[in-house]
Amino acid sequence: MKTEILTLLRETDGYVSGQELCEKFGVSRTAVWKAINQLKEAGYEIEAVQNKGYRLVSVPDILSESELQSARKTRWIGEKIAFFDVVDSTNTRAKQLAEEGAPNGTYVIAERQDAGKGRRGRGFDSPAGQGIWMTLVLKPEIDPNHASMITLVTALAVSKAITDMTGRPAGIKWPNDIIMSGKKVCGILTEMSAQFDYVNHIVVGIGINVQNKSFPKDIESVATSLFIETKEHYHRAELVELIWEAFEHYYEIFLQTEDLSGLVNEYNSHLVNMHQQVKVLDPKEPFEGKAMGITPKGELIVDTWESRKLVSTGEVSVRGIYGYV
């Protein structure tokens, strides 16, 4: 009931009377009073005025299931939310839930990860209260060979959401990093369980530095946060909702064709590598060239002095000639 009351208070501009809450949820005034007090204890500022009722004044920056559900506007993402104060890795937990039958659109979110996962087995620093660490479960009926494009769909959604929230450009470093001022603010890790021609499930992990004021010496030259970039604090649950709204939109476009043909132009407009000299760290043979955008299959187009090459996602990294981007 706490979540339902919070949702109603969010949706109402003025006051909601105690009687209205009792009638709507079929509970006593004492039960309403207890739920309101629980919300206040969690950090919600709720004004109570005699003969008027209750009004939500402000919300805290917390990632509870009640907060996330009450802010939810998506159609199918987040019907089931698994919130944890601490997990080893949201990707690991999401895979477990997927294998146990969690429905499409379920997501795992945590205040802290003890063993966050990055690309190619790297760790991902995930301190409590500082960022958004979450993983979405997808169960699409697509060719497993097309699954890697979902990473690019996710990057586009995160780029748009951060740009919309902060008013600052958040670009994409192909294929899976979000960049502000030349530094990484978000990483994306997509993992799949599949048969030869069938996807069991896909999990899409997103890690965003939001409130961080500083970083360890070994990554401070390449990492940033929304706070560092704007000197403002952001309500993380609101950003989560913006990301999932954008993702639903872009993902459904992707599913229509199982490629990025409907998203290429928008993706390229967010691509920080676009028309930049890049170094492709291909294990077989590294090379340099100019990035010219992506193909409908999500490959990075790189023009070298002798030919045009198409770079696929996977074990290949792309760096700027003079730095990370």
Regions found by a protein language model. Give the residues of each.
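Long, positively charged amphipathic alpha-helical accessory segments at protein N-termini or as interdomain linkers
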Residues: 1-27, 37, 41-42, 143-146, ...
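N-terminal lobe of the biotin/lipoate ligase/transferase fold
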Residues: 2-163, 234
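A short, compositionally biased micro-patch
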Residues: 49, 127, 173, 294-295
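Short loop/edge segments at beta-strand edges and connector loops
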Residues: 85, 172-174
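Short connector loops at helix/strand junctions that flank enzyme active sites
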Residues: 103, 127-131, 173, 183, ...
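Conserved active-site carboxylates
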Residues: 177
